[in-house]
Amino acid sequence: MASTASEIIAFMVSISGWVLVSSTLPTDYWKVSTIDGTVITTATYWANLWKACVTDSTGVSNCKDFPSMLALDGYIQACRGLMIAAVSLGFFGSIFALFGMKCTKVGGSDKAKAKIACLAGIVFILSGLCSMTGCSLYANKITTEFFDPLFVEQKYELGAALFIGWAGASLCIIGGVIFCFSISDNNKTPRYTYNGATSVMSSRTKYHGGEDFKTTNPSKQFDKNAYV
């Protein structure tokens, strides 16, 4: 029962993390222009993995998609690949988890389901690591430019998508670890105490002993009468 409960908790935590990681891809605010050192702000610049936008003081936004993948900076291409890999791994981890959980009717025997659940945990951990690496790489680029005194272009701050990605990655890793530890509970063999033999023997001696006594007494009496 404890193993089933831990698997359900791990599944809910992992799915929540995967949903958060998936929501970072369409999120606009991966980085937002800083207002540090500016007196008058006429526009706000922000960008994600797919486009760069600017919002003026009236609230009108103009966006421009990145024209060519090969013309992009290397860190953006790496973040794209890592985040897409994280979402894909989380999807397959969810499928493996459904087959490996003991509360489901698919997956075969308990031993086979335990192995599938452990595999789901490993996949979720990899998904979390990919998301954590992608968000950290993007954040490292932002902070490096922000604290560089020789960088004269527009400086940015960390956007909300990075924090969502870090939170989702942490949940995926935690859920994956719980899935991996659940296999140890499934491999534990229960101990049985056998007390039936003593009770059976005592009952046999109780009921059959009297019958043997009754059947032997007439024969002894007959032998005595035969010699009189």
From Swiss-Prot:
Per its UniProt record, what InterPro entries does this chain match?
Answer: Claudin, Claudin10, Claudin_CS, PMP22/EMP/MP20/Claudin
What this chain does, per the record?
A: Forms paracellular channels: polymerizes in tight junction strands with cation- and anion-selective channels through the strands, conveying epithelial permeability in a process known as paracellular tight junction permeability.
Keyword set includes Transmembrane = yes
Keywords in UniProt for this one? Cell junction, Cell membrane, Disease variant, Ichthyosis, Ion transport, Membrane, Tight junction, Transmembrane, Transmembrane helix, Transport
Q: What is known of its domains?
A: The fourth transmembrane region (161-181) is necessary for integration into tight junctions.
Q: Which PROSITE patterns match?
A: CLAUDIN (PS01346)
Question: What happens after mutating residue 131 to L?
Answer: In HELIX; strongly reduced localization at the plasma membrane
Sequence intervals crossing the membrane: 1-21, 81-101, 116-136, 161-181
Name the UniProt record assigns to this protein: Claudin-10
* Connected disease: HELIX syndrome: An autosomal recessive disease characterized by congenital heat intolerance, generalized anhidrosis, inability to produce tears, dry mouth, electrolyte imbalance, and ichthyosis.
Tissue spec: Expressed in the kidney, eccrine sweat glands and in all layers of the epidermis. In the kidney, it is detected in the thick ascending limb of Henle's loop (TAL). In the sweat glands, it is expressed in cells from secretory portions, corresponding to the clear cells.
Give a single Pfam family match.
Answer: PMP22_Claudin
Q: Check the record and name the Gene3D superfamilies matching this protein.
A: 1.20.140.150
Q: Which residues lie on this side of the membrane: Cytoplasmic?
A: 102-115, 182-228
UniProt keyword Membrane present: yes
- Native source organism of the sequence: Homo sapiens (Human)
Catalysed reactions listed for this entry: NH4(+)(in) = NH4(+)(out); methylamine(out) = methylamine(in)
Alphabetically, the GO molecular function entries are: identical protein binding; paracellular tight junction channel activity; structural molecule activity
Q: Which GO terms describe its biological process?
A: bicellular tight junction assembly; calcium-independent cell-cell adhesion via plasma membrane cell-adhesion molecules; cell adhesion; monoatomic ion transport; paracellular transport; regulation of monoatomic ion transport
Side of membrane Extracellular, spans: 22-80, 137-160
| Family per similarity comment | Belongs to the claudin family.
Cleavable signal peptide: none
| Subunit and interaction comment | Can form homodimers both in trans (interaction between CLDN10 molecules in opposing membranes) and in cis (interaction between CLDN10 molecules within one membrane).
Got a GO cellular component term for this one? cytoplasm
